[in-house]
Design a protein with these regions (language model features):
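Conserved C-terminal structural/oligomerization subdomain of aldehyde/semialdehyde dehydrogenase
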Residues: 1-111
Length: 111
């Protein structure tokens, strides 16, 4: 059942949860009806359909026909209660920066 604890929480271990679904819309609803969103996976022979599903899954990363295909250049991070921000890639560098705008009037005058 989609409401089971094992299907609702992130379990950092070798666990696979398999839930039946009737159609595409139900599969997306089950995938997104959780408080977490670190990663997800889609396995399909139809790459176009898999890409469409991956775009609708609310997760920081979605793997298609593989598991953890990332590299040091690939941003990694979650959505929802899985956290915000990204590790690795240019997105990670942004988390170390504080952007500041300084505007200076260079006209000489009495101030």
């Amino acid at each position: 059942e989609p409401g089971m604890q094992i299907a609702q929480e992130e379990i950092f271990g070798p666990v696979l949860t398999v839930l039946p679904f009737s159609d595409r819309e139900e599969a997306i609803a089950i995938a997104n009806d959780v408080e977490y969103g670190l990663t997800g996976g889609v396995f399909s022979r139809d790459i176009k359909q898999a890409l469409n599903l991956a775009q609708e899954i609310e997760a920081g990363g979605v793997y298609v026909n593989e598991w953890f295909g990332g590299s040091v250049e690939t941003p990694f991070g979650g959505m929802k209660k899985s956290g915000i921000g990204r590790e690795k890639g240019f997105e990670a560098l942004d988390s170390y920066l504080q952007t500041k705008n300084i505007s200076i009037n260079l006209d000489e005058g009495d101030y």
